[in-house]
Each structure stands twice: as C-alpha cells, then as structure tokens.
Amino acid sequence: MSRNGRNDYDYDDDYDNDQMGGRLARDRERDSEGYLYTKTGERNRRSGPEARERNRENALNRSRNDGRFAPERGGRGYGDDDVKYTKSGRVNGRTTREARERNSRTARSEERDELGRFIGKRGSSRATRGTYTEGANDAAQLLLGGKQGVAENPETDERHSDAFRMEHRRLAEERERDEFGRFLPTEDGEDGRRGRRSNSRRRSSNARSTSSRSSGSRSSGSRSSGSRSSGSRSTGSKTSSRSSGSKTSRSSGSSRSRSGSSGSKSGRSRNSRSGTSGRSSNSRSGSRSGSSSRSSNSRSGSRSSSRSGSSRR
C-alpha cells in the first residue's frame, strides 16, 4: 500500500519534498518504455508517457490566474477578483487586496530585532508567540495534564533569552548539511531530525504486568474487592485486581469471578468450600490471588494459564 492509502499503484514522486526524503521522479531511472516502478516492483501506471502527456494537456487546459489554478476549476489560487476562497466558497477576508496591502505596510513599518523577529507590543501575539503568559490557555493546558513543554515564565527561563536563541542559531549555521539542506548526522549519533533518534531508549525491556495487583491475602472468607467488582466471594484470599476486562476463572476454591476496570460484572462464587483454598488453574489476566500465590507471565488481555495458591488447611 502506498503512503496515500491506495492499493493499486504508488504515486509518482514528482511532488516529494525534502522532509519526506523521497527522490524526485526526474532523478529516477525509467525503463525502455518510460515507466517508473513502485517499491514492490510493480509498474507505476501514472508514470507512463501516455499518462504524463494526458496530465500535461489537462494542466494546460485549466484556467489559471497569476500562474495558479483558479477556484472555479477546483484550485485554491487567487480568482478573477484577486482574492482567495475558503473551502465553503466564501471570500477569505484576509486575502483581499486591501488586507494584503495593509499587512505589507504594517510589516514594513514594524521594528524587528537582530534575529529578524517583530518587536510587538507587550502581550501581543507577535511578541509572546511560543511562550507562556500567565492565565493564557489554562483550561487547555490543564486538559493536557499541566503546562507541558511550555516555559512557566519567559522572563526567567533561559530558553527564551536572546543569548540562548543566538547560540542555537550559531550552532545550526555551523552544522553540516546535505544537498537538501538537512542536517548531517553528528558524532554522537544525532541525525538532525526532530523526534527521531537512532537508539531505541523508549522501548522498555522489562515488560511489567501493569494489569493486576493483589493487595494482601486473608484466609478467612473475605470478599474480592477489585475495581468495581462486588459480589464475587472467594474463600481464602482477598484479591484486588486492577486488570482491564479480564476473567479470573476458578481462583481459590473454585470461585468464578469477572472483574473489570470500569463497569465490570462479577458473578457469585459457585461451590466454594470454606476452609480450603484449592488450586486455581488457568487464571486469565494475572491477578495475584490466594495466600502466597504468584501468577507468572501475566498481562492484561493475554491468556496465561498459571497455577496459583496451592495452600491447604
């Protein structure tokens, strides 16, 4: 499947930009008939001479304005009245000639700093863009779990100081780049692409069972107090399972209980003998149940047939 979600053919790479890392179609080799091939080795039907000629004729026949396709033919360029249109067909007010001339005059008249940024009034969007101002977007930040990645105070945070920005700019100018302007890998393995690292530190090697945990065990007919599981009585153990949507079948004295994290169903125990906490076999979702019981290789959602708690009295 191509990156555009099509199964039958891959798109030509004429439009690939530098960030996507694709090669331009004119730099790729074609076969004797002028076709390109997809990554899977199939012939790209859109790269043939007939398709390319047809596309060229269609492009020449489309009405244009200032070198761009006009909106009445599906383009987003300036129309005959020199404005752009929204997707719903209305005039975009910021693209009118008056608005563009006003923006141009404002941009030329406003003062800039040594980095080329606008020096706007304090509190304006131009002066504080990318920084955190007290009271701004508090609700949105709380929904995200706090002010993540945002400076608490731009006045004292060094990342917003001019010296820090100048140093970053100097380091960026000194780094080597390839033919497309991308940073070349450095000695420490940094490849210059934000969000991508050459090592795999994000993968945790110890797969912990985050699904269920037991909170103590009692040997006198207590209730299983899991996440909203009320009504499943187990003789000989107190299980507090936090597993999401798991089944604990026949745990401690053949009591069948279903416990889930939210809105779970828990059935009554059947044939529970008081005094004996028997073997629990095939307990799905490793919730630790019974006295001195252990579930090995337990994960939420996975089936692990583990024997737990073979204590007899």
UniProtKB/Swiss-Prot annotation:
Output the Gene Ontology cellular-component terms: virion component
Transmembrane segment boundaries = none
Name where it's found: Virion
**Taxonomic placement:** Viruses, Varidnaviria, Bamfordvirae, Nucleocytoviricota, Megaviricetes
Q: What is its main location?
A: virion
Q: Which domain of life is it from?
A: Viruses
Q: Does the keyword Kinase apply?
A: no
Sorted UniProt keywords: Virion
- Which species is listed as the source? Acanthamoeba polyphaga mimivirus (APMV)
* Compositional bias annotation for Basic residues: 194-205
Residue ranges under compositional bias (Basic and acidic residues)?
A: 24-33, 40-85, 95-116, 156-181
* Stretches the record annotates as Disordered: 1-313
Q: Where is this chain compositionally biased, Low complexity type?
A: 206-266, 272-313
What name is this protein filed under?
Answer: Uncharacterized protein R705
